């Protein structure tokens, strides 16, 4: 009798161990592929999943929330082990996240946060301190102009995106005690190069062919790279006639720095999935709940280290 019980217990333990060791499947609702940084984030997520033996299913939202919601519902229907979301905007997520919660599928937010009353609808948000990122650019500008008058034009990210809201806020906080620095125009460039160029062209036209503009602050590098092209086409020198400051740290911004056409960028790591996978595996193993906010590092880079930083970006999928 005892021998039989021991055998049954051993089999049960083995089956439990096998269940824990079973490969995980994660659905990832990605915003889109609007920038070099976003492409790198997707590439790094694939790499992080592969080295853990996790099956990663990626759905490109094409910068539309309705597409992302459909993808999340599809992942719920498929019965995935977890869902990662890089939310295009901060609001409107409650209904679909409740569906995931009812299905007992944990949700992890990457890069961007959401605005929900019920914080139990997601496990954690893996993101940078986007307010700090905006502030780092603002602090740099205050020192750079050293009290001289400086009119700034701002290329905002996607309207309603948490990163756009926070990066705007951080920059504004940094310059609030610098009366010599004023934001004279601000408009969304939707985080894309083409839109960044288009909006910058309108800013230049409205401001005496750019002569009234001291600096362009963009919520990501891709928009400022588009703006650099617009500045050049207007017969001005980017990085000199009009200073630039942006966020992401993509390879092309370091190339622009090396060419003397860009001044400052705050690097945002594309590895948002790694910490999320770590948290998921701990949760699946023993129920460990992660902190609600997992912050990644943000660092200001200037032209003097551009070549070195560019080398680090090789083979990252930008």
Swiss-Prot record:
Localisation per UniProt entry: Periplasm
Binding site for beta-D-galactofuranose: 34-38, 111-112, 167, 220, 248
Keywords: Disulfide bond, Periplasm, Signal, Sugar transport, Transport
Top-rank lineage group of the source organism: Bacteria
Signal peptide: 1-21
Pfam families (alphabetical): Peripla_BP_4
Molecular function GO labels: galactose binding; monosaccharide binding
GO BP terms, alphabetized: galactose transmembrane transport; hexose import across plasma membrane
Keyword presence, Disulfide bond: yes
GO cellular component assignments: ATP-binding cassette (ABC) transporter complex, substrate-binding subunit-containing; outer membrane-bounded periplasmic space
Role this protein plays: Part of the ABC transporter complex YtfQRT-YjfF involved in galactofuranose transport. Binds to both alpha- and beta-galactofuranose.
Assembly: The complex is composed of two ATP-binding proteins (YtfR), two transmembrane proteins (YtfT and YjfF) and a solute-binding protein (YtfQ).
Similarity-based family: Belongs to the bacterial solute-binding protein 2 family.
Name under which the protein is recorded: Galactofuranose-binding protein YtfQ
Gene: ytfQ
